[in-house]
Amino acid sequence: MTQLSSNDVPSMGRRQFMNLLTFGTATGVALGALYPVANYFMPLRAGGGGGGTSAKDELGNPITKTGWLATHQAGDRSLVQGLKGDPTYLIVNEVGEIGEFGLNAICTHLGCVVPWDSGANKFICPCHGSQYDTNGKVVRGPAPLSLALAHVDIEDDAVLVKQWSETDFRTNENPWWA
């Protein structure tokens, strides 16, 4: 058996190797733990190049304009998954087209999902009775604010929901949700 010369032997000692191994493992674990945190603050967007989020049905399938209008009539307000997966109402206007805005269905009082009451022609919160008109403006408390607005755009038959940052047309104030 031949012996290696001192030039052929690596210069890293056992202690240095264990320190490097420990540091590498700790770094890997820390980065792995930080990934979900970073993903929470910077979620991936579903949607087209316009920066919107694809509106999705209850099964998570993207909604198309033609498919939606085939099953929803004028005046209809139905829930979809909108921005950040929040329940959002798509509104079919009097002309039979999807409206230019949607309404976040989360009550501004305690966060309950507010259903549309077609008989009363308004949104009525089941938790504490807050009421909102057809455009989501609060008309009876205890909810302090109107429902949040979202832009609804159609791109290549896909229904996209986008952040609303302009003045709230219902109150002529800056949006509280932006």
Swiss-Prot record:
One of its GO terms (cellular component) is plasma membrane-derived thylakoid membrane. Residues 65-161 form the Rieske domain. Gene3D superfamilies: Rieske [2Fe-2S] iron-sulphur domain, Single helix bin. Keywords: 2Fe-2S, Disulfide bond, Electron transport, Iron, Iron-sulfur, Membrane, Metal-binding, Thylakoid, Translocase, Transmembrane, Transmembrane helix, Transport. [2Fe-2S] cluster binds at residues 107, 109, 125, 128. Its cofactor is [2Fe-2S] cluster. One of its GO terms (molecular function) is monooxygenase activity. It catalyses: 2 oxidized [plastocyanin] + a plastoquinol + 2 H(+)(in) = 2 reduced [plastocyanin] + a plastoquinone + 4 H(+)(out). It is a single-pass membrane protein. SUPFAM superfamilies: ISP domain (SSF50022). It is an enzyme of class 7 (translocase). It holds the Pfam family Rieske. InterPro entries: Cyt_b6_f_Rieske, Rieske_2Fe-2S, Rieske_2Fe-2S_sf, Rieske_Fe-S_prot, Rieske_Fe-S_prot_C, TAT_signal. The chain crosses the membrane at residues 20-42. Binds 1 [2Fe-2S] cluster per subunit. One of its GO terms (biological process) is photosynthesis. Its EC number is 7.1.1.6. PANTHER family: CYTOCHROME B-C1 COMPLEX SUBUNIT RIESKE, MITOCHONDRIAL. The 4 large subunits of the cytochrome b6-f complex are cytochrome b6, subunit IV (17 kDa polypeptide, PetD), cytochrome f and the Rieske protein, while the 4 small subunits are PetG, PetL, PetM and PetN. The complex functions as a dimer. Component of the cytochrome b6-f complex, which mediates electron transfer between photosystem II (PSII) and photosystem I (PSI), cyclic electron flow around PSI, and state transitions. HAMAP family: Cytb6_f_Rieske (MF_01335). Belongs to the Rieske iron-sulfur protein family. This is Cytochrome b6-f complex iron-sulfur subunit. It comes from Prochlorococcus marinus (strain MIT 9301).
